[in-house]
Amino acid sequence: TIDVEGREALIRRRGRANIKEQLAILRRAAAQGAQVMVVECMAVQPELQRAAQQDILRADIGVITNVRRDHTDVMGDTLEQICDALCNTVPRNGVLFTAEEEQAGRMSAWAGQLSCAFVPVRPQGDEPALDFPENTALALAVCQHLGVERATALEGMARFRRDPYALSLHRLGRGVFINGLSINDIQSTCMVWETLREKYGLEDRE
């Protein structure tokens, strides 16, 4: 976690991650007088996704980056089923941002049922190379919604410290090691490989 003063603290667990952890984080944020809290939905099972949003977080702003074939054992085999599972986190009477294109119509319908404003986001082409353009565009859109000027948001993004498990590339002699531990599905893996291959001039090998 990162508190309002920018101090980082490890989450120490005795077992697997649990959505109840967010209760303690909410209490800590309230005690520090936080005006905004950014938190990832930890749940993958649809009923727990619903509980995390409706019973614990009750977020005003939701962000669904994309819909990919991930956690198919609990979220469904099709993109439509996975989209429906993710939409359990859509905030009632709130705002939903997404860079997803294929399932955007389905998300918009979910948002409409919950009186939630739907904001599709597309990269403008001038996003800095901090992350994938869609992710940066989403962050900038949410910042703008909260009244943060684009220049201020970009200045803050330029100073952030990357997660040690974030995508990275390391050259080892004549070989290359790609740290892709944060990639969870085949579609994302292929997209990342194509991006890195084009950026660094990598070649496919048998």
Question: Could you describe each region identified by the protein language model?
Answer:
Residues 1-62, 66, 70-83:
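ATP-dependent carboxylate-amine ligase catalytic core
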Residues 102-103, 181-206:
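Active-site beta-alpha connecting loops in nucleotide-dependent enzymes
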Residues 127-138, 162-166, 182:
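Short glycine/threonine-rich catalytic loop with a Thr-x-Gly-x-Asp
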Residues 143-183:
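Gly/charged, well-structured mid-domain segments that form the phosphate/adenylate-handling core
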Residues 53-59, 88-93, 200-203:
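Short, conserved loop/helix-junction motifs that constitute active-site signature segments
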Residues 61-120, 189:
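Conserved catalytic-core segment of NTP-binding enzymes
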Residues 116-130, 152-159, 168:
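Beta-strand->loop->alpha-helix junctions that form or flank phosphate-binding loops
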Residues 56-66, 130-158:
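A conserved, hydrophobic alpha-helical segment in the catalytic core
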